[in-house]
Amino acid sequence: MKTKTIVFIHGMYMNSLCWEHWVNLCQTKGYRCLAPDWPGRDKPIEVLRKNHPDQQLGHLTLGRVLEHFADTIKTLDEKPIIIGHSMGGLAVQLLLQRDLAVAGVAIDSAPPMGVFTTKWSFLKSNWPHITPFVSQNSPIEMTFERFQYTFVNSFPLAEQRAAYERYVVPESRRIPRNSLTARVGFKKSHPPLLLIAGSADNIIPASLIKSNYAKYKRTSSVTDFKEFAGRTHFIIGQKNWEEVAEYILAWLNEKGV
């Protein structure tokens, strides 16, 4: 029997609102969709911004986010499909190896330990939240100018501004630092996994996703890679996002899940 439940996992600097269009589309395809917020993020965007700097946010860790989603998944009546974006993509990789899902899709996945690049756009985009010169307990705001470069670099200005105002929230510095030591068991068998990259992504370059994908070559488990031309890091909210979503749904159907 095919799974009809999808759990969406958002990434850094956003909450579950970023999945609004995906949830609607997948529901029309007959899926039950859950898009939980990270701990403490189940508030309106304007409230999350107003609360900056939120000391509770400053102490949020990747481990806590993972357990939050693991606990949610364990309450379901069937193993779900999990789809994550950015740090949510890394969460998919980590949860999949715990056998908590029937399949996973990691979109623009943040790199786990052992996957790195010296590409300038990656270093420039990630330095503000991993710099050792600022306390890890200090939450960070995403400025509009930084959002333009890291998430929506090819969007028209009006669309950049609209996306920033609708979706962007402050973030914990601990989470990206935790990802540097997040261990993915690349040799371990796992349910089907699809890694997706955007060719115009500055913060998580497509070459980095390819390196992530290549690490799985020593396992016989199904691991696939797809690069979408012209897509930025905010591929899930970019024009023609439906093309990406439909590709994923077709892939899931092909894999029998």
Where is each model-derived feature located?
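Short alpha-helix in the alpha/beta-hydrolase fold that links the catalytic acid
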Residues: 205-215
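Catalytic active-site module of serine/aspartate enzymes centered on a nucleophile-bearing elbow/loop
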Residues: 222-257
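Active-site glycine-rich loops that stabilize anionic/oxyanionic intermediates
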Residues: 11-14, 199
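Conserved alpha/beta-hydrolase
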Residues: 27-52
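Short beta-strand/loop motif that positions the catalytic acidic residue
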Residues: 189, 195-197, 201
